[in-house]
C-alpha cells in the first residue's frame, strides 16, 4: 500500500486548523498538527478526523505538543506566531515572532531537514528569511505564502469589476507582502486579454483599476477591520494549499510566492514576492518579468521596505 506524504502544520490556530481540513478533504497526505498549547492540536485533530468520516477521508491526523512527531515530514507549513495586537509596534511583533521562528527552524533542521517548507507567519518576508537562515535548508525548499493570496484578492475585485467568472481572471502581484506590494495590471488578464486592453475597449477605467489596486494592497487590513478580533484565514490557507499541491504532485505551477532571490530582479539575499515554478524539487525556477520603469520603481520601493524590516533582526 502506497504511503501517504507526511505533512506537518506548525501552529494550530485558525489557519492551521483550516489547512488541516483542506488537506484532509483533498487527501493530500497524513497530517501532524503541532502547537505549544496543550490540548488544542489534539482537540482539533479529533474533531477533524470525525469530520473526515463524513467526507469519506481516510487521512490520519495527529495532534501533538512534541516536535519529534514532525520527524521525516515531506512538507511543513508554518503559521506559528503571535498576531499583531492593538498598541503593539511592528518591531515588537518582529522581535517576538523571530524568537518563535528560530525555535521552529531548529526543530525543522533536527527532525525534517528534507522537507519543503511554506511559511505563513507575519511579517512574512522577514519570517521566511529567518526560517532559511536558521534551518540551513536549501533556499529552493523554503518559500513564503504571499502573492497567491494577494492575487486571489486582486482576482476577486477584477472579476467583480468586469462582471465575469473568477476562473476567467489571472492576475499578478509582486513585491513584499505588505502595503507596498505591486499589483501589475499589465500582466493581469481576463480570459487572456490584458487589463489595459479592456480599459481601451471601455469596459473599465484607469481610475477604477487604481482603486482596485489600492483595495488589493489593503486586502488583509480590510478583513482585520471587519473582524475586529482577528485576521483572514480561509484565503491564506487555500493559498498555501495551492503551493503545497504543486510540490507534492509535481504540477510545476507558476505561482507568485516569497522566494529567495540571488540576483534575479537585481535583488540579492532577500525574500520577495515573484512568480516561481513549483515542482517536486521545490522552487524549480524564478520567472523574471520585464518591468517598465514605473513598475520597477514600485518594485524596488517594495524591496527597500523588506530590507528595512530585515535590518531590525540583524
Curated annotation (Swiss-Prot):
Catalysed reaction equations from the record: (S)-malate + NAD(+) = oxaloacetate + NADH + H(+)
Keywords linked to the UniProt accession: NAD, Oxidoreductase, Tricarboxylic acid cycle
GO MF terms held by the record: L-lactate dehydrogenase activity; L-malate dehydrogenase (NAD+) activity
E.C. code: 1.1.1.37
Cystine connections: none
SUPFAM superfamilies noted in UniProt: LDH C-terminal domain-like, NAD(P)-binding Rossmann-fold domains
Signal peptide, first to last residue: none
The family this protein is said to belong to: Belongs to the LDH/MDH superfamily. MDH type 3 family.
Protein name in the entry: Malate dehydrogenase
Lineage, opening ranks: Bacteria, Pseudomonadati, Pseudomonadota, Alphaproteobacteria, Rickettsiales
